[in-house]
From Swiss-Prot:
Species of provenance: Corynebacterium glutamicum (strain ATCC 13032 / DSM 20300 / JCM 1318 / BCRC 11384 / CCUG 27702 / LMG 3730 / NBRC 12168 / NCIMB 10025 / NRRL B-2784 / 534)
Any one GO molecular function term: structural constituent of ribosome
GO BP term, pick one: cytoplasmic translation
GO CC annotation terms, alphabetical: large ribosomal subunit
Region annotation (Disordered) ranges: 29-58, 225-280
Stored SMART domains: Ribosomal_L2, Ribosomal_L2_C
Name used for this protein in its record: Large ribosomal subunit protein uL2
Keyword Cell inner membrane in annotation: no
Compositional bias (Basic residues): 45-58, 270-280
PROSITE patterns: RIBOSOMAL_L2
Function noted in UniProt: One of the primary rRNA binding proteins. Required for association of the 30S and 50S subunits to form the 70S ribosome, for tRNA binding and peptide bond formation. It has been suggested to have peptidyltransferase activity; this is somewhat controversial. Makes several contacts with the 16S rRNA in the 70S ribosome.
Length: 280
């Protein structure tokens, strides 16, 4: 994916860049695979904010993605188009199965229009093919990996993400995650060969607040500039430092949010490396 940088004709364009969409072969999505997508504005069913800084943005329609591919084993499919999906960072590929059905999948790097792919234990080790982990050779780069057999892919689904299959131990496969964490997964789980495409998406600079509003992101306001009624750090005469250790608007102390005794921790062989550049 090529990235286009604008000339600095305005302050907003000076720092902005956009994708050239060179891999996209069709601009209109498949109508039968679209679903309505209503916005929540970051609120739950009670109207309470559960995710801050969300709201507005361009109207979208959800593209139904096949994250399982287990009911099409042995059926060949031809890549009809590579399309843009506003709901995710990765591009999507429209498959025309030889039995007449159409489905979307995540577009791996190197998958082009006209390529024939398949799924199942007997499929070749080829970019875009979907197989159980027990049938994939050690050292293969994979993505779209399941955590539970038949539950659909949960791991390595964003643009440029990939997982390496390090080995197989009994009924488990050992995987190196994008975070460098090494964990075990049931060997019956399925994965797709290759890495997710559109890897340069991370290099796009949005340039101005307006483009983030188009994407549905609202401003982030510091607690120290709020009133005391709105944030524990708010208030004070003049410019203050907050007067206490950093907390959330609800008084929750800043720090790690992951559960220390999560049930899936037993599958972790080695923790991910700490970010050395993180300020402490």
């Amino acid at each position: 994916m090529a990235i286009r940088k604008y000339k600095p004709t305005t302050p907003g364009r000076r720092a902005s860049s956009v994708s050239m969409f060179t891999e996209i072969t069709r601009s209109t999505p498949e109508k039968s695979l679209l679903r309505p997508l209503s916005k929540t504005g970051g609120r739950n069913s009670h109207g309470h904010i559960t995710t801050r800084h969300r709201g507005g943005g361009h109207k979208r329609r959800y593209r139904v993605i096949d994250f399982r591919r287990n009911d099409k084993d042995g059926v060949l499919a031809k890549v009809a188009h590579i399309e843009y999906d506003p709901n995710r960072t990765a591009n999507i590929a429209l498959l025309h199965y030889f039995d007449g059905e159409k489905r979307y999948i995540l577009a791996p790097k190197g998958l082009t229009q006209g390529t024939v792919i398949e799924s199942g234990a007997a499929a070749d080790i080829k970019v875009g093919n979907n197989l159980p982990l027990r049938n994939i050779p050690t050292g293969t780069t994979i993505h779209n990996v399941e955590l539970k057999p038949g539950a659909g892919a949960k791991l390595a689904r964003s643009a440029g993400a990939s997982i390496q299959l390090l080995g197989k131990e009994g009924s488990y496969a050992v995987l190196r995650m994008p975070s460098s964490e090494i964990r075990r997964v049931d060997i019956r789980c399925r994965a797709t060969v290759g890495e997710v495409g559109n890897a340069e998406q991370i290099n796009i600079r949005w340039g101005k607040a307006g483009r983030m509003r188009w994407k549905g992101w609202r401003p982030t306001v510091r607690g120290v500039v709020m009133n005391p009624v709105d944030h524990p750090h708010g208030g004070g005469e003049g410019k203050t430092s907050g007067g206490r250790h950093p907390v959330s608007p609800w008084g929750q102390k800043e720090g790690r949010t992951r559960k220390p005794k999560r049930y899936s921790d037993d599958m972790i062989v080695r923790r991910r490396r700490a970010n050395k550049n993180k300020k402490r």
